[in-house]
Amino acid sequence: MPQFSVDLCLFDLDGTIVSTTTAAESAWKKLCRQHGVDPVELFKHSHGARSQEMMKKFFPKLDNTDNKGVLALEKDMADNYLDTVSLIPGAENLLLSLDVDTETQKKLPERKWAIVTSGSPYLAFSWFETILKNVGKPKVFITGFDVKNGKPDPEGYSRARDLLRQDLQLTGKQDLKYVVFEDAPVGIKAGKAMGAITVGITSSYDKSVLFDAGADYVVCDLTQVSVVKNNENGIVIQVNNPLTRD
């Protein structure tokens, strides 16, 4: 099984850690009905994109001052469709395993992983207060409100990498290595643009779309990803039975 060594792990959230497609589509459809927008057309562009970009493109007359339109939409998702939200298989175990030294089995003093999502802080943080409560919100957590440029621009992932580098006192390390876990082609492209190894999850797109976007490995879910080694010197990740293009 293929293995690779990294210093940091960077995760998208929706579709990568948490399965939110039904909740997101339900809330967007409701908003589309209220404003006479074709949801089919919106869904061609929405996955992996920041909600504020979708608001500007499809709801130009909706008042989104201070992102209040986005917050209302994503509050609707979190408050009214929580029963449709679930964890991507293997996600919780993978995140928890990244917090433990494999040699001593003790909890590491600092987390080596971060979240980079296109969602709002309200929606993204809410999952760590509900279905990801056992994991807890990581210190480095980049949302769509923290960047000027959304995916496929690498700004979000680059910012998370730099913050982790600082927290872990790795600023002097020249050959820093990192992996990005993503379910959307725009996210895969963002990861590749900042020099990361990329692992695509087929929760939202066919494997061919993820490979075409540049994914180095593609899996069905995170049960196929395991931490072989994790200590102060780095992380060794194993991808079990990765999908192939054929």
Swiss-Prot record:
One of its GO terms (biological process) is glucose metabolic process. Substrate binds at residues 83, 92, 146-149. Its cofactor is Mg(2+). Pfam families: Hydrolase. InterPro entries: HAD-like_sf, HAD-like_SPP, HAD-SF_hydro_IA, HAD_sf, PGP-like_dom2. SUPFAM superfamilies: HAD-like (SSF56784). One of its GO terms (cellular component) is cytoplasm. Mg(2+) binds at residues 83, 183. Optimum pH is 6. Gene3D superfamilies: HAD superfamily/HAD-like (3.40.50.1000), Putative phosphatase, domain 2 (1.10.150.240). The keyword RNA-binding does not apply. The keyword Magnesium applies. Optimum temperature is 40 degrees Celsius. Its EC number is 3.1.3.68. It catalyses: 2-deoxy-D-glucose 6-phosphate + H2O = 2-deoxy-D-glucose + phosphate. It is an enzyme of class 3 (hydrolase). Keywords: Hydrolase, Magnesium, Metal-binding. GO terms for molecular function: 2-deoxyglucose-6-phosphatase activity; metal ion binding. The active site is at 83 (nucleophile). Phosphatase that is active on 2-deoxy-D-glucose 6-phosphate (2-DOG-6P), but not very active on fructose-1-P. Belongs to the HAD-like hydrolase superfamily. DOG/GPP family. Present with 2400 molecules/cell in log phase SD medium. This is 2-deoxyglucose-6-phosphate phosphatase 2. It comes from Saccharomyces cerevisiae (strain ATCC 204508 / S288c) (Baker's yeast). The lineage of its organism: Eukaryota, Fungi, Dikarya, Ascomycota, Saccharomycotina.
